[in-house]
From Swiss-Prot:
Catalytic activity, as annotated: 3-phosphoshikimate + phosphoenolpyruvate = 5-O-(1-carboxyvinyl)-3-phosphoshikimate + phosphate
Compartments, record wording: Cytoplasm
Gene Ontology cellular-component terms listed: cytoplasm
Pathway participation: Metabolic intermediate biosynthesis; chorismate biosynthesis; chorismate from D-erythrose 4-phosphate and phosphoenolpyruvate: step 6/7
Keyword list, A-Z: Amino-acid biosynthesis, Aromatic amino acid biosynthesis, Cytoplasm, Transferase
Name of the featured protein: 3-phosphoshikimate 1-carboxyvinyltransferase
Length: 446
């Protein structure tokens, strides 16, 4: 999809990548730090916040509902919260831009407050399904009117009329979704009694960690079958916090793969969050033979962090265990790029969720990789990729990024190992999650 404001960009065969970089703050943690700070009583401070379009949409929405949020000249953010139950009626629609995380989590917050909010977004976000969040929030008493989308999906624009007091519930997640889980837990903050989420497959647990750090009455139990039971007792005050946001592993993924596949590369990526529910890509790439060293392991704000040293490696194709998918769901597009240069066949399954991301990431990656000379077969729930054994790809194509930041960056990395340049039709969407992506890449090529 292109328009008058599209910014095409070509990426060519690269010199070895060398150096040390710090990537932007984790997107998931940045969203949640703003939301919970805005519900605390008092002033919270956040350092290292990701200042991409998605997180700024969350900041604007929390301001619109009464929180005092300001960025200082030194980059630290100060948030004066309104307290749980204190959200105010926004005057206008809340513009979510391209951010599915902002939309789904804020729907949860609004659902248990006595306010009404209209959510709007860009063309990409307005095609994404919201029914998975609407169902549990409706059971808690919220009245939600959504727009009809393709194949019966409930989409933006939508209106949430919150109910206070909301109705606590016990909800078993029908699919692995950290966003649905988080929406219910955030709704539970202002709901009397205990709200429970039953999670058969673990997903990223930033919400649970951060809710605990802010003083929410939250417990996590794992039953004999490995199912997680997350319970939150509502109407407890949240205490303001000082938060340091670690580097985003989903952003680090692009430079991890680039360093592995560009011959002669040796890159250190500082301060990467390695939450076990997010670290699947590192484990999969190591299993493929990737030389990834974890240095100076430490913990910051309840989150495990390390510096990653990554060196060019000969990768081997593997069959990726579908159980690992939730811990790297956003990293599969760039893993597919790595697989195109591996020796042998890489098989991925269980990735239905990729079809309802910012784009249908399975179809878009399969089409684009074929266009630049990769051998790819698309199945209903994954891709099968036969790698080149390290030989460069043909390249020489223009790729439709479909306004999807991770697609755009994945093909940028593919261009670094292609004989002819790979052109991304519009690089602008990268700003949603990684505003300085191109600058960091250029720095490693010096």
């Amino acid at each position: 999809m292109t328009d008058q404001t599209a910014t095409p960009r070509s990426f060519s065969a690269s010199v070895p990548l060398k150096g040390r970089i710090a990537i932007p703050g984790d997107k998931s943690i940045s969203h949640r730090s703003l939301m919970l700070s805005a519900l605390a009583v008092g002033e919270s401070r956040v350092a290292g916040l990701l200042e991409g379009h998605d997180v700024l949409a969350t900041a604007a929405a929390m301001r619109a509902m009464g929180a005092d949020i300001a960025r200082r000249d030194d980059g630290e953010w100060r948030i004066h919260g309104v307290g749980v139950g204190g959200l105010l009626q926004p005057r206008g629609a809340l513009d979510m831009g391209n951010s599915g995380t902002s939309t789904r989590l804020l729907m949860g917050l609004v659902a248990s407050h006595p306010i009404t909010a209209t959510f709007v977004g860009d063309a990409s976000l307005s095609g994404r399904p919201m029914g998975r969040v609407i169902d549990p929030l409706t059971q808690m008493g919220a009245d939600i009117s959504a727009s009809p989308g393709a194949r019966g999906a409930k989409t933006l624009p939508l209106m949430v009329r919150g109910l206070a007091p909301a109705i606590p519930l016990s909800y078993r997640l029908p699919m692995a979704s950290a966003q649905v889980k988080s929406a219910i837990l955030l709704a539970g903050l202002n709901t009397p009694g205990v709200t429970e989420v039953i999670e058969p497959v673990p997903t990223r647990d930033h919400s649970e960690r951060m809710l605990g750090a802010f003083g929410a009455d939250l417990t996590v139990d794992i039953d004999a079958g490995g199912t997680r039971h997350i319970r939150i007792r509502g109407e407890a005050d949240l205490k303001p916090q000082a938060i340091i946001v670690p580097g985003d592993p989903s952003s680090a993924a692009f430079f991890i793969v680039a360093a592995l596949i560009v011959p002669g590369s040796d890159v250190t990526i500082a301060n990467v969050g390695l939450n076990p529910t997010r670290a699947g890509l590192v484990e999969v790439l190591k299993a493929m033979g990737g030389d990834i060293e974890l240095l100076d392991r430490r913990e910051i704000g309840g989150e495990p962090v390390a510096d990653l040293r990554v060196r060019h490696s000969v990768l081997k194709g593997i069959e990726v265990d579908p159980a690992v998918a939730p811990s790297m769901i956003d990293e599969f597009p760039v893993l597919f790029v790595a697989a195109t240069l591996a020796e042998g066949r890489t098989v991925t399954t269980g990735l239905d969720e990729l079809r309802v991301k910012e784009s249908d990431r399975l179809a878009v990656m399969a089409t684009g990789l074929k266009a630049i000379g990769a051998r790819v077969e698309e199945s209903q729930d994954g891709l099968v990729i036969d790698g080149t054994g390290g030989d460069p790809l043909a390249g020489g194509a223009t790729i439709a990024g479909h306004l999807d930041h991770r697609i755009c960056m994945s093909f940028a990395i593919a261009g670094l190992v292609s004989k002819a340049p790979v052109t991304v039709d519009d690089i602008a969407p990268v700003a949603t999650s990684f505003p300085n992506f191109e600058a960091l890449l250029a720095g490693l090529q010096q």
